[in-house]
Amino acid sequence: MRRTGQRRGAQNPHTLGGRRAHGPKVEKIWARKLNQKERRLARDSALTATIDMEMVSSRGHRVSDEVDSLPIILGDYVEIKDGKSQEFDIESFNHGSATRKVIAIFNELGLGEDLQRARDGRKVRAGKATMRGRVHKTPKSVLLVVKEKSGLAQAARNLPGVDVVAAKDLNAEDLAPGGDVGRLTVFTKSALEELN
């Protein structure tokens, strides 16, 4: 029985100040399982949609008229010093003011408008999410698929709306955020080789 100053009876759900009758369980697993073949099929169909210029533009991405076909593939780059040329893998390029270099690369590829769209489209979210740390909502821009997350990946990850994914971790959610297929995607040559 309950004595004065003790709250032993308050553990019952039907007593005053008692616990909740059927509260949320910690053990509940919210992740949904998906068959491996279904997951692969979803990824492959989302990958196929990145090729279609119409689907990419209908998703809201802005690409300059100079871009003839999608997806965009970054090969090796050549640096010329003292008349000698050296070829480097694009993923391991020099880190000196690297994010500026990535912006310059994207502008040369005709993706500058889409980066600007993501930067300007950043809005303060409505509702209680702002109190929970999810203050801003940023539109998705370029998806950069690399072999390893170093060099180019580290330089591009801070751009608003740009997502960087290793080829082995590529999934349908990255290629079709919110279930809308046709994301503007840039692959590196080595990432494409790893995907095959």
Q: Which residue ranges define each predicted feature?
A:
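Active-site cofactor/substrate anionic-group-binding motifs, chiefly glycine-
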Residues: 1-9
